[in-house]
Structures are given as structure tokens and as C-alpha cells.
């Protein structure tokens, strides 16, 4: 494994300590912190309920982010989706690989490599990445 600097811009406000990337405030937390919270909520609510909540919230957030980035960079169509997948890949969730995309149907087949969930939880025998489906 080789190391590299982050590929996305990170700005830190010297007064507030707020991190910003792509003009959005960000949180920088350890992977285990996020995953442990995710697993605890899943256990409390059940996978189906939690997956639905995550889908709806993720869809809303992804739509908002894509609109803002498309406007900022003059992107349209598939280019917006590709930019989004690239940015997700640069943030440590894993490497998102688009295998197929049908803009007319509004569908895509995406493979996730190097998932943060698998790195933290190991192979569990079930799909852990359902939180990304709304994204």
C-alpha cells in the first residue's frame, strides 16, 4: 500500500474548527466510531426499518449535493453521477465502481470495493453496505 494526500479539498475554519469540502461542512470521525454507531442503531431498529430510513435520508442528501456540484462545475447527466461516485470514493467509504448506467431509466449498477464496513466488521455473511443504496 502506498500513501497519498487526500484528493479532495479540505478547508478548516481557524475560528470554529469546522471542516469544509465541496462547500459543505464535514465531520471527520474515526471509522470505528461511525460503524459502531451504525451497528448499534441497526440492532435497535432492525435492518429493514433502518435501511428505509437511511435510503430516504441518503437520497435526499445525494440529490442536494449533486444539484449543488452540478451547478458549481457545470456538470450534466452521467457526468454528475460520475463526479459523485468519485467524491464518495475519495472520502474513505470504499471505492465505488460504476459497472453500468442507464440515464433514461435512472438506474446504475455500482460495485463497492474496499468497503469501510468490511474493513471494520470483517466478513459477516450479510450485506452491510445497504446504507449506500439511497446515495
Residue ranges and their predicted role:
Residues 1-109, 114-132:
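N-terminal accessory segment detector
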Amino acid at each position: 500500500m502506498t500513501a497519498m494526500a487526500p484528493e479532495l479539498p479540505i478547508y478548516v475554519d481557524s475560528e470554529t474548527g469546522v471542516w469544509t469540502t465541496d462547500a459543505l461542512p464535514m465531520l471527520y470521525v474515526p471509522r470505528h466510531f461511525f460503524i459502531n454507531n451504525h451497528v448499534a442503531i441497526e440492532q435497535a431498529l432492525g435492518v429493514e426499518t433502518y435501511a428505509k430510513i437511511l435510503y430516504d435520508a441518503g437520497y435526499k442528501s445525494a440529490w442536494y449535493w449533486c444539484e449543488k456540484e452540478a451547478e458549481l462545475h457545470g456538470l450534466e447527466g452521467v457526468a454528475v453521477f460520475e463526479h459523485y461516485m468519485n467524491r464518495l470514493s475519495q472520502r474513505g467509504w470504499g471505492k465505488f465502481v460504476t459497472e453500468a448506467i442507464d440515464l433514461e431509466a435512472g438506474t446504475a449498477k455500482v460495485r463497492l470495493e474496499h468497503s469501510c464496513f468490511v474493513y471494520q466488521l470483517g466478513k459477516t455473511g450479510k450485506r452491510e453496505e445497504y446504507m449506500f443504496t439511497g446515495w
